[in-house]
């Protein structure tokens, strides 16, 4: 879609939602909405919780810019509704969104594509699990299968702390992933227009890049480009693109890795709707890696909006 064509559209920026990441989504959505208004586009901010279809009809939305995070926004649900309503939207389609949001199924897809993933086990709510039952030793990372922004994530170093970590993760999901803890650089690759645009390194003040570090100013150092030898820098970008393709993603995403001292790149996850706040990583990668201002990034994503039925994503 050209800029002139986009000018003719009434854009609904979908934000808020019902997930544990609601507050972050509101920040992302308002940043996108303000950028669209500043460029002269017909944008309306929509806090979608219930009656989404009714809101979209009443507002006469021609195009949806999805700034939702977490359940119902990032997992294929809203994408399916928009497909049914024949409203073009930004980002990946139903299947790719659902796969990326589900950490177990996405890991299986990554492994099938030959990408390196962290060793893992799963635990269902109601099952008892102790450290001796795990196929690898402590420390481990415990996380809900379907949450983002590190919600419900705990690093467990002592056997007696495992059950509390599982209980915390079970607050958000009935299936929990237990991953072997891998020490390495936290590196995140930006994908835009289905191509890698750079890799940034995160050095959190906390033990890992948790919710506080992601959304509180000064809680993490961002280093661009990531401090990797050039061959390794190119390797992690290429693997980011492979992960994007393995899930059938469309347009843009952010791919998270742990890179060890010996050059192994452990793929953690693909974020199909990465944050678009002032502290978010994709806008920073786009600015430093591709020379795109925040407004230019928003415009490019909006112009890529489409229906995906019949496509891979």
From Swiss-Prot:
It is found in: Cytoplasm. Pathway: Cell wall biogenesis; peptidoglycan biosynthesis. GO terms for molecular function: ATP binding; D-alanine-D-alanine ligase activity; metal ion binding. Keywords: ATP-binding, Cell shape, Cell wall biogenesis/degradation, Cytoplasm, Ligase, Magnesium, Manganese, Metal-binding, Nucleotide-binding, Peptidoglycan synthesis. One of its GO terms (biological process) is peptidoglycan biosynthetic process. One of its GO terms (cellular component) is cytoplasm. ATP binds at residues 135-188. Binds 2 magnesium or manganese ions per subunit. InterPro entries: ATP-grasp, ATP_grasp_subdomain_1, D-Ala_lig_Van_CS, D_ala_D_ala, Dala_Dala_lig_C, Dala_Dala_lig_N, PreATP-grasp_dom_sf. It comes from the Bacteria. Residues 107-303 form the ATP-grasp domain. Its cofactor is Mg(2+); Mn(2+). Its EC number is 6.3.2.4. Mg(2+) 2 binds at residues 269, 271. It catalyses: 2 D-alanine + ATP = D-alanyl-D-alanine + ADP + phosphate + H(+). Mg(2+) 1 binds at residues 256, 269. Belongs to the D-alanine--D-alanine ligase family. NCBIfam families: D_ala_D_alaTIGR, PRK01372.1, PRK01966.1-4. Cell wall formation. HAMAP family: Dala_Dala_lig. PANTHER family: D-ALANINE--D-ALANINE LIGASE, D-ALANINE--D-ALANINE LIGASE B. This is D-alanine--D-alanine ligase. It comes from Trichlorobacter lovleyi (strain ATCC BAA-1151 / DSM 17278 / SZ). The lineage of its organism: Bacteria, Pseudomonadati, Thermodesulfobacteriota, Desulfuromonadia, Geobacterales.
